[in-house]
Amino acid sequence: MAPRVGLGLGQLEAVTILLLLGLLQSGIRADGTEASCGAVIQPRITGGGSAKPGQWPWQVSITYDGNHVCGGSLVSNKWVVSAAHCFPREHSREAYEVKLGAHQLDSYSNDTVVHTVAQIITHSSYREEGSQGDIAFIRLSSPVTFSRYIRPICLPAANASFPNGLHCTVTGWGHVAPSVSLQTPRPLQQLEVPLISRETCSCLYNINAVPEEPHTIQQDMLCAGYVKGGKDACQGDSGGPLSCPMEGIWYLAGIVSWGDACGAPNRPGVYTLTSTYASWIHHHVAELQPRVVPQTQESQPDGHLCNHHPVFSSAAAPKLLRPVLFLPLGLTLGLLSLWLEH
């Protein structure tokens, strides 16, 4: 009889470690449950530019008739959050698809999967770009398998508060300047932006405001960006995530919604404040459980950003330079300033 061949203690430990690493990379914990939300394997890289593959595993591309139209955020193995204005009523649900695990939109990768859309739920209060209720839920036609490139982000609970000055990250494949598309192979772009209080944001949007086109920062909106401009979001990535870190966990603090031109001074990006829709989310998707956000950082007063900023002016803007209101957003990542120089 042939002798039985077994593993020694050291070999068993090594195999166990390898199995655990494999489970973590596949998005499954050792107990067989799904990956926890808001966790990333790639280390965080601050600033702006091209992201690393798998750095923002909840980022999705929403396509219509095969063309990228919006971003979105994976929040479970069946649901994606995006902006309501990405889904005009005249558009057919069957023409939408969701691309997950993508890094370069123009390059094929085994890590990328495409799902059709089974259901689209938009908030009933949404009316037009710039109005409240700019949030939508998309149910995938079949559950997605988590991996190191496909993982969910955490939804914040209703009482969640993200402090002014907190550096968050907006991501997407949008234009790099007004009417200037991201060049092939269109790698995912990232931009770190500080949060701005609603009061200061309203103050900034009243600078050089056009009376016929008022800017209203609603209670369900969140602002982030730079007062001097040059780094912002632009056309093409509405619906994408504004991801904010709290104690090592990433939360979907905002959804790219609207803005006044791309990278213009005194015009930070405006996002749908996800936490204000926690009860609406639970009503429509009971299986999703928003997560309590730890309050470990105090908000920094930021009124000086408006009242004493050198760009401040009470004069009306020249008509030829007047920006377009309520523009769907995507990332400029500072390239806007270079584009303007030419």
From Swiss-Prot:
Topology of this chain in the membrane: Single-pass membrane protein
One function term, GO molecular function aspect: serine-type endopeptidase activity
Protein keywords: Cell membrane, Disulfide bond, Glycoprotein, Hydrolase, Membrane, Protease, Secreted, Serine protease, Signal, Transmembrane, Transmembrane helix, Zymogen
GO CC annotation, single: membrane raft
Positions annotated as active site in the UniProt record: 85 (charge relay system), 134 (charge relay system), 238 (charge relay system)
Residue stretch(es) of the prosequence: 30-32, 323-342
Disulfide-bonded cysteines: 37-154, 70-86, 168-244, 201-223, 234-262
Gene3D superfamilies: Trypsin-like serine proteases (2.40.10.10)
Chief site of localization: membrane
Record EC number: 3.4.21.-
InterPro entries according to UniProt: Peptidase_S1_PA, Peptidase_S1_PA_chymotrypsin, Peptidase_S1A, Trypsin_dom, TRYPSIN_HIS, TRYPSIN_SER
Listed transmembrane segments: 320-340
Peptidase S1 domain location: 45-286
Classification via SMART domains: Tryp_SPc
Glycosylation sites: 110, 159
Superkingdom: Eukaryota
Biological process terms in GO annotation: positive regulation of sodium ion transport; proteolysis; transepithelial transport
Signal peptide: 1-29
Localization per Swiss-Prot or TrEMBL: Cell membrane
Subunit composition and interactions: Heterodimer of two chains, light and heavy, held by a disulfide bond.
Role summary: Possesses a trypsin-like cleavage specificity with a preference for poly-basic substrates. Stimulates epithelial sodium channel (ENaC) activity through activating cleavage of the gamma subunits (SCNN1G).
Family indicated by similarity: Belongs to the peptidase S1 family.
Name of the protein: Prostasin
